[in-house]
Amino acid sequence: MKPLIAIVGRPNVGKSTLFNRLVGRRKAMVDDMPGVTRDRNYADVNRFDVPFILIDTGGFEPETSDRLLQQMREQSQLAMDEADLILFVMDGRDGLTPADVEVVEMLRRVNKPVFYVVNKIDGDRQENAAGDFYSLGIEQIFTISAEHNRGVNDLMEEVIAALPNKTAPAVDEEVTRIAVIGRPNVGKSTLVNRLLGVERVVANPTPGTTRDSIDTYFNCNKKRYLLIDTAGIRRKGKTTEKIEKYSVVDSLRSIERADVVLIVIDAEEGVTEQDTKIAGYAFEAGRGCIFVVNKWDAISKDNASMGIFVEKIRMEFKYLPFAPIVFVSAKTGQRLGKIMTEVDSVMEQFAKRISTSDLNRVFSKAVEEHHAPLYQGRRVKFYFATQVGTKPPSIVIFTNRPDGVHFSYERYIINRFRDAFGFTGTPMRLLFKGREGRKRG
């Protein structure tokens, strides 16, 4: 399990600038997929060959204008509760503020690494002006300019050295790992209890990697499954005071460890922006995805209602057209059996491997029927394709212009592979590599 680093601080101190600096320019295919939120406030980062999840808590601030100190308290509480390491950012141009001082006092009581960062220090003149911050009595303060990349590498070397070693517990590869994610009060807790209770599980709780986490094994139709962080789902499902926008943080750890993710949506409330944000991370993490529309029993409906709701999901989650949709009532148990049927189906596709000959038969025909657009006035040539991984299915395509393949053509190729081989419920990864040789089309 990857460690989680939270960036906290009052608005406009440069949290987002530091976040973007550390994330860098993402080259993943997802960047060009329609519907994926561009203003992400969480990301997978690899620094000095160490992977971690980075959270910009500034992105979780309420849109309405609340009191500044209240916002800072909420951000800091989030960091203290969820993160493995905290970067507390202050503004070197504004100087030390009373709000900064209060949060520092809160962070002194945290039993995890805290790094105190003074941003917007662009040169020696600003460095000298940052002396006020040393009055906090903190042993080490890092002065940086996130905008100009000054001091950032030195900071991150220390941060990486301080990260805890997050080793995930060994899990039987034959077990399908399921994460249940969604906004507060969509019925995750009831759904989990139903799944465990209906299947008459004899649970063997094992400690997970998250705080107070319990993973629960259960059996269904002679197969073994692992529900991730069931204690966390139950506990957090009862917490009403937690700000809704923070709920995405609760999902990150579970998604990282899952094979298949159940994205729970409230039928009464419909699809919200937060739903798309949480689902987007499951997609980017490359997990099998199933939409579970809960509370279907609680709404007035007619013969067209289900079709209308499906269209709404497909419109709002354009990057997940392959994900099955199940309509259930966790409260009554209606259609719950359909969930496990879909889990088995998605897991089979998630781990599917296609032979190179079959793959190239479909690929060659796709290229012949629809050539790639010209790149810098030259034709993009393709040589062959081969599957290099599963969970999710990952395919390398050799070409003379790996940078010249438009994202729309990537989608075309993926859709042709899906038409031929299925891959229902699972993302697919395409990687284009350069090679000279005999072309396929």
UniProtKB/Swiss-Prot annotation:
Residues 3-167, 176-351 form the EngA-type G domain. Pfam families: KH_dom-like (PF14714), MMR_HSR1 (PF01926). Keywords: GTP-binding, Nucleotide-binding, Repeat, Ribosome biogenesis. GO terms for molecular function: GTP binding; ribosome binding. It comes from the Bacteria. GO terms for biological process: ribosome biogenesis. GTPase that plays an essential role in the late steps of ribosome biogenesis. Belongs to the TRAFAC class TrmE-Era-EngA-EngB-Septin-like GTPase superfamily. EngA (Der) GTPase family. This is GTPase Der. The lineage of its organism: Bacteria, Pseudomonadati, Thermodesulfobacteriota, Desulfuromonadia, Geobacterales. The gene is der.
